[in-house]
Amino acid sequence: MKLELRISNYDLLDEYLKRDIDIIGFGDEYCEWAIFNVPKLKEVVKKTLEAGKTVRVVTSFTTKECFENTVRLIEELGLISKEIEFVVNDYGVLQYLHKKEIDNKIIIGQMLNHSLEEYLWSDEIIKQESEKVKNSWLYSNFGNESVIEYFKEKYHIAGGIFNLLPFGKKVQKLCRELIGK
């Protein structure tokens, strides 16, 4: 198992690089403004790669206002190294990267791979439903082989980020078998 540390305070990078961590992540699933200091991010990405760590850049759900900045950031960082992994949480960004034929590893993020199971009130929402409906609502939108195969073939996804709740664990196992991660 690999250990990832997601950071937002770049000033502490030297300290983080000393730790026994495999992956250093930059960005945030929920805040599209968290990674737009491009010159600083380029600097910390290069330093992280030089330290022998895997770099994972996390993009959020992207509004129209931030779309251009997000894809420009990915393109610029992709020029630094093809080893940088990008966690994508927006279908529009995923489609754009596919059309641009970006060679970096693309990982489906939590915002694209979510389920009702993650919400605290999910039991209350589905308590009157049949078991079949409950299972459908609780299962991730990446919870079947055909969806995983489609994204693997069309978008060349290299993996996904999953919750560790019961249904999330099932989807994680299925993806591991189909994607090999």
Regions found by a protein language model. Give the residues of each.
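Active-site pocket-lining/capping segments in soluble small-molecule metabolic enzymes
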Residues: M1-V44, K53, V58-K181
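Active-site catalytic motif of lipid deacylating hydrolases and related acyltransferases
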Residues: T48
